[in-house]
Amino acid sequence: IRLKGVCAPQRMLFSNGFFAGCLMPEAKGFGLEGPLDKCFAGWSRADLAQLAVTILKTIGSLHRFNVLVGDVNLSNIRVVSPDEAYLIDCDSVQVANLPCPVGHEMYTAPEIRGRDFSTFLRSKSSENHAVAALIFMLLMPDEDLDESGKYRLGARRISSDPFLLDYPGFHRGEPLTLCRRARIWSHLPDDLKSAFGRTFDSRGNLHAEADRLGVAGWILRLNAYRERLLDGTLLADDPLANEIYPKTGRKILPPARPACVVR
């Protein structure tokens, strides 16, 4: 596999006739597996949306060759800039009839959760769920989730049922303490909230295996999100919309009063 942004094995190495390992392209940049406050210093939310698109385009290029990443997760990504990122640990991707033997429960689609990944081939639809979880985690960078994929606040998974956060058409009926991740969520536009909610909530029309958004669908939504940040559309109603770590939840601004014309 020789694709831009993919650090996959290029050559096998042998020692005294025994397989010793593989050579792979060097991945530059910083990792996304830890606290990201310092990593994203100076970044805007528009930059974060562009990074998500960059990563999705790389995943999409693999899909076009019928290759699935399999072990989709933030720790397998290194970042140089919003326009340059690398998928690493690509020696475990699913190719032809060779399954990806590893995975993280946090990103795993409900229909394959708890199974031995080495015993079956994932579907692209299952990968689409992982992609949605990846984008959710990237747009909502925080440590409110532990390694098992559970909220420290509420102890529930992102893709638990019901989904923890309000989205258009569904309200939990009980307030969620406004932790940093919930504050970030409040500043996302409704179309993105809806896409995430309808994917992770079993009542949503994007939850079923056959109905999930693919890479192209997420790219379309993220590009629109970025454009509305850059042209000021979202900032007109929400001055903190472009902040990666807003200090407060979104405040609904009153409609602008029409100018008074004196005749």
Question: Can you say where each PLM-predicted feature lies in the sequence?
Answer:
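Conserved C-lobe activation region of Hanks-type protein kinase-like domains
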Residues: I135-K193
